[in-house]
Each structure stands twice: as C-alpha cells, then as structure tokens.
Amino acid sequence: MHSSLIKLGFLLLLIQVSLSHAQLSPSFYDKTCPQVFDIATTTIVNALRSDPRIAASILRLHFHDCFVNGCDASILLDNTTSFRTEKDAFGNANSARGFDVIDKMKAAVEKACPKTVSCADLLAIAAQESVVLAGGPSWRVPNGRRDSLRGFMDLANDNLPAPFFTLNQLKDRFKNVGLDRASDLVALSGGHTFGKNQCQFIMDRLYNFSNTGLPDPTLDKSYLSTLRKQCPRNGNQSVLVDFDLRTPTLFDNKYYVNLKENKGLIQSDQELFSSPDASDTLPLVREYADGQGKFFDAFAKAMIRMSSLSPLTGKQGEIRLNCRVVNSKSKIMDVVEDALEFASSM
C-alpha cells in the first residue's frame, strides 16, 4: 500500500508538471536546435525563387494561426474524422497558402533536430524570417510553444477578421483574442504592405458598396479606375491584386502612405484611416506613414505580443512530427494511461 501511495504521489506531481505553463523564451532552442533559424531562412529563400509572394503568405498563416486558440499550429492540420480543418474556414479556404513550404521546413528540421521543434514555433520563426527577407524588421521570436491536438474550424470562422469589416468589428476581433491596443491593430494590419488579394474580396467596394449600387466613397477615384480594370464586374474573381500598388513585394511603410491617400485595397484596411471611429487609429496611420522606423518598431512589438497569445507550453499538446497530422499517441494520453495503470494496480 505504501508503495502504491508513493506511485500515486509521483503520478500527481507528474500530471501537475505536465499541465503547467512554461515560459516562452527567444533562447529556447539555443542548445537543442540552434540551426532552426538558418533552416527556416534557407527554405524560404528557395521558395521565393519561384513564388515571390510566399513570404507574405507565410506571415498570413502565422497571423491566422494565432487568432484561433492561440499560436498552436492548428491551422496546419488536415481534415480528420474527428474535426474539420481550419483550412476550410471562410478566412482560409482557397486563400491560405504556404503549407508545402512549412512541410519542407519541418522535414529539414526533423532531420537536424528530431522531435525538438514544434510546428507552432516553426511557423512563428518562419513568419519573422519572411518579414526580414522582404526588407522588414527583425525581432527575437519567443519560443517554447507546443502543437495542438486538433483543429478549430468553427472558432476560425468566429475569430478571423474579414476584409469587409468596419473598424469597430476589427477592434472587437482583436480585443477578443487579447490584442486590445490600437497599436496592435494598426501595426499588424501593416502586414498588408506586401502580398496579394483576390478580386472577390473587393468587388462590393468597387461596384456595390453597402448595397448602394455605387463604389466605396472613401476610395480614391484614380485607384478605383485602376482596380476596376483589374477586376471587371463580370470578370474572374480569383484574379490577384497587389495590396500595395507602390512596392508590392517589399515590407515597408508604404501601406500607410496608401491609406492616407485613400488607396487601401480592402475596406478593413481603409477603415483604419477613414472611419468616423478612427480617432485612435488615424494618428498611428499618419505616424507610421511618416516614419518607417516607428512602424517597424511597433510591428515587431505587436508580433511578439500576438505570437505569445495563449500558447500551449510545458507538456501540453505535443511536438508534431508532421505538421499536417497529430502524432499517433500524444504525451497527454501517455500520462492518462499511466494514471489508469497505477490506479488498477492499487
């Protein structure tokens, strides 16, 4: 009996440790896998040779991951019989991309450091490296996240901002996930300084804004004409349009210059400057438009805040071996099975 009590006490301690939250740290892989950063960079550089927009796509993947149950790589999971993938959510279907690049990155990392780097951390690192490769700021990514054991499609539909959102709707979505500062919203929206968007997401702005039969009145007339040529009323709505008409592949502050000139591509972007409720966001748009350094600093800080949202840490979740599927047996299940075994032996 005494031996059984010792075993039970040890088991309870193990469970307590397993469910505890460890601290995210930029030095998390310094000893266990310092080469992960070089592997991420090399993989993205190779992908950029054939796909100039992949850096923007990877940043978007990380953003959409963090907005759904925290940064847990749930967006990378494929469909299973027990859950629907977040890839099928409205904000991701036929638009989220870059999964194959993350797959290649993960395979290389597993070869160099087996069972060490989580997919959640890898996506956070890849997002940072993507921004740097496009000319943007660098920051030390806090690592130590674990990967989720399932996807959350319904939560993705509830949490991801939409391109037709008003400013107040945007603020609500950001606040709901823990990003309640105006600088979070304005700086992170600056991720639209590179990359592309599909015509389908701006058709109402161009031809029937708020069911008026007219274009969005905040849209610059010359820019409206340019966009209508790229996205004709009865044209292919999958055609891609640059977010930033000035420097479409560079990560810079021209996104904010565009907003000041009423040349934001999607409604939710222009809302930061043109909405009647923009008293706290408009000054930041002007500040970032006038000073790229201020934008870069704010973006780096906001990325660190976003990437630290509700992480799985310690023994929570798992370190997936393949980012598309959960491991055959999770660490948590190991603990549960040990508990049942000890209980049955008492």
Curated annotation (Swiss-Prot):
Name of the protein in question: Peroxidase 37
Subcellular location: Secreted; Vacuole
Database matches in PROSITE patterns: PEROXIDASE_1, PEROXIDASE_2, PEROXIDASE_4
Protein residues bound to Ca(2+) 1: 65, 68, 70, 72, 74
Keyword DNA repair: no
Glycosylation site residues: 79, 208, 236
Family listed: Belongs to the peroxidase family. Classical plant (class III) peroxidase subfamily.
Functional summary from the UniProt entry: Removal of H(2)O(2), oxidation of toxic reductants, biosynthesis and degradation of lignin, suberization, auxin catabolism, response to environmental stresses such as wounding, pathogen attack and oxidative stress. These functions might be dependent on each isozyme/isoform in each plant tissue.
Gene: PER37
